[in-house]
Amino acid sequence: MLIDTALEAHYAERDENVRLTSTVKGQFELARMQHLLGQYLPDPPAVVGDIGGGPGTHARWLRDRGYSVELLDPIPHHVAQARAAGIDACVGDARKLPWEDEYFDAVLMAGPLYHLTCLEDRLTALQEATRVTRPGGFVAVVALNRTANLIGALLANELQQRQPVVQEILDTGFSPANDRMAETTYHTVSQLRQEMSGHGLRSITVHGLTGPGGWLTVALDAHFHHQQPPATLTDPDPLQTALTCSRIADRFPELLPASSQFFAVGQRA
């Protein structure tokens, strides 16, 4: 089985194709991803693997910048959407990639690491991503912060209802009762560094993908997604405020745990 049935149902209920464009939080996350990818990708033309690339949001951006992109995702509907957008895409498993050794100049793995709840599976996926990357190329992964549910529930004023789930995720990194995203594991910074190490990757660097600025966008979407926010939350543009905040925070490693998502990068030895 490529994907857990609960996770498949989760994505069947949501249009992943518009997730990063239909909300302030999504637009913010997309802008941050593009900013961080730009720091590590080789100049185009180059061949980039998008592992767990969903319907191809990142792949389309990479293609439009001049990269050759090949996408893999376990959900056939996502692969069909990516193909419809002109992306070379296939159904597959991050733990058993179909490409030969040293095939890509760089690899992005934005989904599999947090949807593989077994440590052995995550390590296998990292080994596979490293295997298909050429020496000197970067492997970039996205992970979710264990504290994200605590702060997110606080800002949405839902902590009292969600406290058991939040506490379990803080304690173990996983909760089978997590109703927000099925079959999802959450990392600490040190845990993510440890999992990234030992696969032929060097110079492991962890960034705050969303940084502290992301929490402004979470609050906006939680309370004003279907209505107009007050003027104090629209002028100046809150998206630009959030981006400015997180770019400032990038210079301070001690602020890394304030990010709801992590962007970790290692270079193939």
Which residues does each PLM region occupy?
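Conserved class I S-adenosyl-L-methionine
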Residues: M1-P44, T57, Q81, F138-I169
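Class I SAM-dependent methyltransferase SAM/SAH-binding core
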Residues: G49, P55-K96
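A short acidic, Gly/Pro-enriched loop at the edge of an enzyme's catalytic core
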Residues: R95-V107
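A short SAM/SAH-binding and catalytic strip from SAM-dependent methyltransferases
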Residues: A106-E120
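A short glycine-rich, Lys/Arg-flanked "PGG" loop and its adjoining helix->strand segment in the class I
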Residues: L123-F138
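Short alpha-helix
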Residues: E183-G200, V206
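C-terminal helical/coil "lid" or tail adjacent to the Rossmann-like core of SAM-dependent
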Residues: I204-P253
